[in-house]
Curated annotation (Swiss-Prot):
The keyword Transferase does not apply. GO terms for cellular component: host cell nuclear matrix; viral tegument. Its main location: virion. It holds the Pfam family Herpes_UL55. Keywords: Host nucleus, Virion, Virion tegument. It comes from Varicella-zoster virus (strain Dumas). This is Tegument protein UL55 homolog. The keyword Transport does not apply. It is found in: Virion tegument; Host nucleus matrix. It comes from the Viruses.
Length: 179
């Protein structure tokens, strides 16, 4: 019971009038394994060359978790039906990743007990052209794990859980009108 005399209905309603930059991205693209591994989250912030493609493919995962051990990752993309080649902006993915990492939502994942405190991050992958110019620049949701068997069946099960979590997070986000 409220003893201050103020009712819930007298509280201001906050409405975000900014356009939602992710509203047009209605498809979630299944996980793509990144062949790069990092020795700790701090090392994942700089563009890292691919072991298979060298500097022709660079990935910055930007993991923010508190664990200091090795990690490997997957990219989970967001797509548009009308413009399949368009990806969201990196800065627009950051608030969505914060939502996905919410300690209120992470326990919904079946593999919650094996997760670190922030398995989702706004990641980028860059492809270099033969001319040395930057070609494709893809911003996507990075999902990482610290399991001892990178890309094992258990690891892929976790990536599948992450995909489902992104789909559900997107539906929740849409229901409340974006972030």
């Amino acid at each position: 019971m409220d003893t201050t005399g103020a009712s819930e209905s007298s509280q201001p309603i906050r409405v975000n009038l900014k356009p939602d930059p992710l509203a047009s991205f209605t498809q979630v693209i299944p996980p793509l394994a990144l062949e790069t591994t990092w020795t700790c989250p701090a090392n994942s912030h700089a563009p890292t060359p691919s072991p298979l493609y060298g500097v022709k493919r660079l990935c910055a995962l930007r993991a923010t978790c508190g664990r200091a051990d090795d990690l490997h990752a997957f990219l989970i993309g967001l797509g548009r039906r009308d413009k399949p080649s368009e990806s969201p902006m990196y800065v627009d993915l950051q608030p969505f990743c914060s939502l996905l990492n919410s300690q209120r939502l992470l326990p919904e994942m079946a593999n919650y007990n094996t997760l670190c405190d922030a398995p989702f991050s706004a990641a980028t992958q860059q492809m270099m052209l033969e001319s040395g110019q930057l070609g494709v620049h893809l911003a996507a949701i990075g999902y990482h794990c610290h399991c001892k068997s990178p890309f094992s069946a258990e690891c892929w099960t976790g990536a599948s859980e992450a995909y489902d979590h992104v789909v559900c997070g997107g539906k929740a986000r849409a229901a409340v009108g974006g972030l």
